[in-house]
Amino acid sequence: MAVVSADKQKVWNCYTMPEHITKWNFADPRWHCPSATNDLKVGGRYFARMEAKDGSFGFDFEAIYSEIFEGEHFTYAFGGRVAHVTFKDLKGKTEVCVMFDPETENPIALQRQGWQAILDNFKNYTETT
């Protein structure tokens, strides 16, 4: 969860528009997100390429939207798992909360840390854009 010092519409736009996603969607400063697409509709596809800046490793994150309530929340499925993202107005600030199904290969604490690091990058980017 992160509380972003920006109105909900700006936060929603920065979270869902590909030209913004590529600026914040990575957990470590040694990584980046060189490309992203987002078809924000039920059945639409979210895609983000994440890779190490030195080119040593990379992966594609793909998800399909199952629920969207514009400006409020969305749910998408990826690799047999689901994530739900909510946006709550806090009088000029916006709370963003990401709930996700963990995968089985890595400890849950490590997964939470990674998702939170990406959310922290998002907060920093949105507040300075």
Short names for language-model regions:
Residues M1-W31:
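Hydrophobic ligand-binding cavity/cleft-lining segments
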Residues V11-W12, I21, Y46-A48, Y65, ...:
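Hydrophobic pocket/interface hotspot
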Residues M1-S5, D39, R49, I64, ...:
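Generic structural detector for well-ordered beta-strands
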Residues F26-S35, G80-V82:
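A short, amphipathic edge element
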Residues M1, K8, C33, R45, ...:
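Intrinsic-disorder/low-complexity, polar/charged segments enriched in Ser/Thr/Lys/Arg/Asp/Glu/Gln
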Residues H32-Y76:
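Glycine-rich portal/gate segments that line the openings of hydrophobic small-molecule binding cavities
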